[in-house]
Structure formats: structure tokens, C-alpha cells
A protein has these predicted regions:
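Conserved Nudix-box catalytic region and its N-terminal flanking loop in Nudix hydrolases
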Residues: 2, 50-52, 61-107
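Residue-level detector of beta-propeller blades
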Residues: 18, 23-24, 122, 147
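Acidic, metal-coordinating catalytic segment for phosphate/diphosphate chemistry
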Residues: 24-64, 68
Length: 199
């Protein structure tokens, strides 16, 4: 990775570093837990808890956006639950009610980075954490993305984005900056898909 690009990347990371944490007493408004008893064949009964997000299962999409210049767009945002407090990954978000995964992918691209793809290719669908959630995620490769608007972020959403070559993404993974399972899985499938398409 070029020195100037690395400096720009680290500058963005530094902007989102946690400098102080204050615990507050507040009833959760987004997360809830549903407890149920399950009766299985073989005379087995289980009691399990399931996490719900905004009263839904929390199914989401993740998109690997690639420009016409073959650069991959990453997003950098505060992720206060992880060790260093800053997440580096790819555009992602929840699937809204009455929305298909494809529609959610296109919406999230426009909201988070202001880009629109010429082609959206499904890569893989997977359960995020089947032990406590029914969230079923969908990964996409977005080809020939073009800038069409400014970001359309929520008031409490802070996202910056940067473009990288495939080798630079691999470097960020090796350095531990991209470490979310959704991002890692989607990138591996996207990389393989792009390799096969070049043949």
C-alpha cells in the first residue's frame, strides 16, 4: 500500500478511536430477547433464547462494491463493541420489511457511499449466529459501481469510505484491520467470483 494512502487510512481510524466510555442506564430499544420452549422428536424439550433486532430477525446484506477501475470500496466506521473500536469492512445493513435482499443491497450502497452498481451478483447466503439468532445474511458483489450521490447517513451514523486494490484489501486483512466474519467471508467469495469472471 502506498505510504500516502496508509497515512490517510490511519488518519480516519484515529478519528473514530474511543477516548472515553460512560455506562448509562437505559432500557434497550433496538435489541430484545425472545424465550421459547421447543418440543422435538425423541421426547426432547429445549428452552432457548433468541435475539431480535428492532422486533425482527436482523437479517442483513453485505456488499463488495467494485468500481470500473477495479478498486474495492471499504467503509470505516465506529464499532464500539470490538477491541479497537473502529470497524473496517464493506457496505452492509439490515433488510427492511417488504424489501428483497437485492433492494437492500442497492439502498445501502447509495446510503453509505453514494454509489450505484451496473450489476449486482449474489455470492452466498448464511446464518450469522445460528445459536442465538435467525438472522440470515446475503452477500453480493456489486460490479462497475459509479458515484451517483452524496452519502445519505442517519444522524447517528458516521461512515467514511476508501477505495483499495484487491492486494491492498488482503494487506488490510493480514494486518488485522478487516476482521469481521461477514466482511471476510464476503470478500473471499467476491475475490473468487472476480477471478472466475476474468477467465
Amino acid at each position: 500500500m502506498r505510504k500516502e494512502k496508509k497515512i490517510e487510512f490511519l488518519k480516519i481510524l484515529n478519528q473514530y478511536q474511543i477516548i472515553k466510555k460512560e455506562k448509562i442506564e437505559k432500557k434497550p430499544s433496538f435489541l430484545s430477547i425472545e424465550t421459547a420452549r421447543y418440543h422435538l422428536n425423541g421426547n426432547i424439550t429445549l428452552i432457548r433464547e433468541k435475539i431480535k433486532k428492532n422486533h425482527k430477525d436482523g437479517s442483513a446484506i453485505i456488499v463488495i462494491p467494485v468500481t470500473k477501475e477495479q478498486e474495492i470500496i471499504t467503509v470505516i466506521e465506529p464499532r464500539v463493541c470490538i477491541k479497537n473500536g473502529v470497524g473496517v469492512g464493506f457496505p452492509a445493513g439490515y433488510i427492511e420489511e417488504n424489501e428483497t435482499p437485492e433492494e437492500a443491497a442497492i439502498r445501502e450502497l447509495q446510503e453509505e457511499i453514494g454509489y450505484q452498481p451496473e450489476q449486482l451478483i449474489p455470492l452466498i447466503s448464511f446464518y450469522q449466529d445460528e445459536g442465538i439468532s435467525s438472522a440470515y445474511n446475503h452477500a453480493f458483489l456489486a460490479r462497475n459501481c459509479q458515484k451517483v450521490s452524496e452519502q445519505q447517513l442517519d444522524p447517528d451514523e458516521y461512515i467514511q469510505y476508501m477505495k483499495f486494490k484487491t492486494e491492498e484489501i488482503e494487506e488490510l486483512i493480514q494486518m488485522g484491520y478487516i476482521n469481521g466474519s461477514n466482511s471476510l467471508l464476503a470478500f473471499q467469495y467476491a475475490k473468487e467470483k472476480m477471478r472466475r469472471m476474468r477467465k
